[in-house]
Amino acid sequence: MKFTLQSTAPQSAQHEYLLVLVTEQQLKNTADTYKINTLDTITHTSQFKSGFNEVLTLIGQAETCSYLNLVGLGDLKDLQPAKIAKLAQTIIKLVQTKFKQIHLDISALPIELHYLFALNLTQANYVFDEFKSKKSEAQLEQIHLITAQTGLTTQQLDLIQAIASGQDLARDLGNRPGNICFPEYLADQAKALAHEFPELLKVTILDEQQMADLGMNAFLAVSQGSDRPGRIITLEYNAQLEQAPVVLVGKGVTFDTGGISIKPAQGMDEMKFDMCGAASVLGTIRTLCEARLPIHVVGAVAAAENMPSGQATRPGDIVTTMSGQTVEILNTDAEGRLVLCDTLTYIKRFNPSLVIDIATLTGACVVALGKVVSGLFSPDDALAQELQQAGEQSFDRVWRLPVMDDYQELLDSPFADIANIGGPYGGAITAACFLQRFTRDYRWAHLDIAGTAWLSGTAKGATGRPVPLLVQFLANRVGTND
C-alpha cells in the first residue's frame, strides 16, 4: 500500500471516497471544508458525538465527494497508541474491499501520532489468502493523506511502505504451513531476496555437512530427527560499508513437535509459527533493501525442523557445541536455544558491533508478559534502552527482564558444562542465561517473541513482529553507526 501527502482537501466530486477524522469541536470546520450544509441536522438526528471509533456515513450529502465517512477520535487526550491501532483497523475495514484508493483527512489527529497511524494502516491492510480457493476481495492500494500540518516527510512514508513490505513478508512466511515452509524453503527465500537486490545482499548457506565440519553439534542434535535437512542462512546487507555490522539472529524452527519430548496434540498446529524469529529477520532485511538504509547489517537464520524419529536426539544426550562447551539435553522441546547457540558462535566471524537474537523461545515468557509485549534480555543497559526506545516509537514494545549470573547455577549439569533447561521456575530467564554463555565476546540482546509473534483464535495468524521494532532500532542508529 502506498501513501501520498496533500496539504488541502479535494475540491471535486470526482474523488469517490473521502474519510475524515473528527472531534466534536471540529465538526463545524469539517462541514465548512467539505461543504456539508446539513451536518448539524444529520449529527443531531443520528446522535453522532464523534466518540472514539464512532462512524457516520454520508452519501451524496457533501459537495466535494459522493461518499464520505466521519470517524470520531473522541477526547484527544485519551488517544494512546493502542487506540490508534484500533482506529486504523476500523478505517481499513470500512474501505478495504470497496476502493482501490481513498482520501483520508488526518488534520484532527495530533501531529505526533501521524507516523504511527500510517504504519498501523499498513498493518491493518494485510490479507493472507494464499491457500484459499476463493480469494479475498481486498483491493485497497493507495491512501492520500490530507493535512495542512504534519511531521511526516516523504522519506518517512517511504520507510513506512518498506516496513510494511518487510512485515508482510514475515507474516506470509509465518503463516505458511510446515509442509511448504521448511528449512530449504527459507534458504530459497533468502536467495530470492539476494536475486532481487544483488547490489545490496550477499547470501551464504551452510548445509549439515558444513555444520558438522564446524562442530555445530547442538544445532544438528535438533535437525537430525527430521528428513528435512537444516540450514544456516546468512544475508549480508551493505557489506561494502566500513563499519562493524549489527547482526540479527533468528530462530527458524519451521515446525516444532517437541521431538522425543513431544508436545500435546492440542495447539500443535501453531508450531509452524516457531520460525517467526527467522521470518522477522528476513522481513527486516527486505525493509532495509527497499529503504536502502546506510547501515551494515547481517541477518542469520537458524533453520531446522524438530521431529521425533529413530535418529532423533534422546533426553539425556550430551553434545559438544561449536564453542566447545558441552550441553546435556534434558528436554528436546528446549530446542530453540540449541540451534541458536551454535549460530551465535558462528556469527562471531563477522566481528559484530552488537548482536540481537529473535526467537519464539519460551512459553514462560508468554506466562510472564502475555501477548502484548516481547521479552527483552540484555546485560547491556545502553543497548536495552535503545531497544526499549525503538519499541515505544514503533509501538512494537518490549519489557526488560533480568539476565544475571544468579540464575546461571540453575543450568548446572552433573554430566556436562550446562543443561539445556533450568527447572520449573524463571524459564524465560534461564533460557536467556543459556544463550548468554555463547555471547560473551560481543554486545548482545535477546528478544523472546513467543507471546507476540502470532495471534490465536479468530484473528489467528503471524503478526510480523518485531520487524517494526528492529527497523526503528536500525533507523535510529543510522546517524551514529556505533
UniProtKB/Swiss-Prot annotation:
Primary location class: cytoplasm
Any Gene Ontology CC annotation: cytoplasm
Catalytic activity annotation: Release of an N-terminal amino acid, Xaa-|-Yaa-, in which Xaa is preferably Leu, but may be other amino acids including Pro although not Arg or Lys, and Yaa may be Pro. Amino acid amides and methyl esters are also readily hydrolyzed, but rates on arylamides are exceedingly low; Release of an N-terminal amino acid, preferentially leucine, but not glutamic or aspartic acids
Residues annotated as catalytic: 263, 337
Record keywords: Aminopeptidase, Cytoplasm, Hydrolase, Manganese, Metal-binding, Protease
Positions bound to Mn(2+) 1: 256, 333, 335
Cofactor binding note: Binds 2 manganese ions per subunit.
Name by which UniProt lists this protein: Probable cytosol aminopeptidase
Gene this protein is translated from: pepA
